[in-house]
Amino acid sequence: MSPHPGDRVRVERADVTNEGILMPSSTSDHLVIKLDGGYNVGIDRADASIDLVTSDAYDIGGTQTDIGSSAGAGADTEADKTESDITSKSAASAVAFDESLPTVSLISTGGTIASTVDYRTGAVTAQFDAEDVLRAVPDLAGRANYRGRVVRNILSENMTPAVWQDLAAAVADEIRAGADGVVVMHGTDTMQYSASALSYMLDTPVPVVFTGSQRSADRPSSDNVMNAVCAVEAATADISGVFVCMHASTADDTCALHRGTRVRKNHTSRRDAFKTVGATPIGKIEYDTETVSFHRDHAARESTELNLTSELNEDVMLLTFTPGMNIDRQTAFLTDSTPDGLIIAGTGLGHVHTEFIPTVAELVADGVVVAMTSQCIEGRVCDRVYDTGRDLLEAGVVEAGDTLPGTAKVKLMWALANHPDPTNAMRKSLAGELQHRSVPWE
């Protein structure tokens, strides 16, 4: 009898032996084995010896499929589908509703934390109701009542302003429907941009908490469970606004709660990649004790009424100045395209090559809002110290203080579409992005 998915098997090929759980494969030419360490390994079936160790050692769900089948071949992908494209399950869930618990809406946009492998097809599924969530993260049970919703199922590098608008509308819908908090599951690469966007689009009376995962669920070092649990705890806390909740350190003990407009992904792969820039995090969540504490002033729950202002002007560019930049080429491009807004990430206190200043003056004269940020991680722009800075101010550049460059771009997109004076808006803090005082750097 041939082994089936879920059986424990021993596979020998080319003098290498692997033992683990047989998983369904998307092709008939390869075996997929989940090793005891949690990782999956693919093995070419040619010349492989397969021995059954234990039957039904692992419940993977779905219909059993013989190892020779190709159930996943040609399966449709859920990537890039919109909310209306995705077939949802019944709103009714087998998960009992507990009136003593708060209600948290879990919204998925894709990314590592929200990805679930459908082993019957080999595809990533976008099904995302309360049962799916609790099946993936059992530790969430008993903390809240959950509603699941998919806005997109995309890699975060494919995020667009249009998706931000759909996401903001979905969050607003969930709050109107009675959610006590919202958790947005999002890929980590562009999470800071999406959190910034919703910070401007939404006045929210409840916490809206972005979270994600640096390591996928099949890896022993995955951070998905702790991040999801801590995000739910933050979403039920006495606070309002838009935040990011991720590992505070490499240990599995605490998550940091960052303001959506002050957070930055500072490492490509570490679990504690996200940091609040220029300040301490808003708060922290202790994983073991489920304690949420706050380090800084924050708006209390229900301290504002829900308001959605989601219009964006996408004609905003972010230009990072570098030595050797072809100024003639940049000038020709900018003056020909004439964006509505330009964010410059300048050097140091906010500088560019002096030969680029006339280009800035020309853009401002044409009605372009030009704001200056710094490439430096810490500190703030001050163009009143050196001649170059003073010349930039005379040319019409707006100092954006210590606003992060990416946040500044999103802010200007929103301000151009919604604020009566976008230039002046860049000088003010609209969503906690601009601090009046930079804390000492350690």
From Swiss-Prot:
Reactions catalysed, as given in the entry: L-glutamyl-tRNA(Gln) + L-glutamine + ATP + H2O = L-glutaminyl-tRNA(Gln) + L-glutamate + ADP + phosphate + H(+)
Keywords: ATP-binding, Ligase, Nucleotide-binding, Protein biosynthesis
InterPro entries registered for this protein in UniProt: AsnA_fam (IPR006033), Asp/glu_Ase-like_sf (IPR036152), Asparaginase/glutaminase-like (IPR006034), Asparaginase/glutaminase_AS1 (IPR020827), Asparaginase/glutaminase_AS2 (IPR027475), Asparaginase_C (IPR040919), GatD (IPR011878), GatD_N (IPR040918)
SMART domains, per the entry: Asparaginase (SM00870)
Intrachain disulfide bonds: none
GO molecular function: asparaginase activity; ATP binding; glutaminyl-tRNA synthase (glutamine-hydrolyzing) activity
EC number annotated for this UniProt entry: 6.3.5.-
Annotated segments matching region Disordered: 63-84
Family to which this protein belongs: Belongs to the asparaginase 1 family. GatD subfamily.
Quaternary assembly: Heterodimer of GatD and GatE.
Protein name, entry field: Glutamyl-tRNA(Gln) amidotransferase subunit D
UniProt organism field: Haloquadratum walsbyi (strain DSM 16790 / HBSQ001)
Gene that this polypeptide is encoded by: gatD
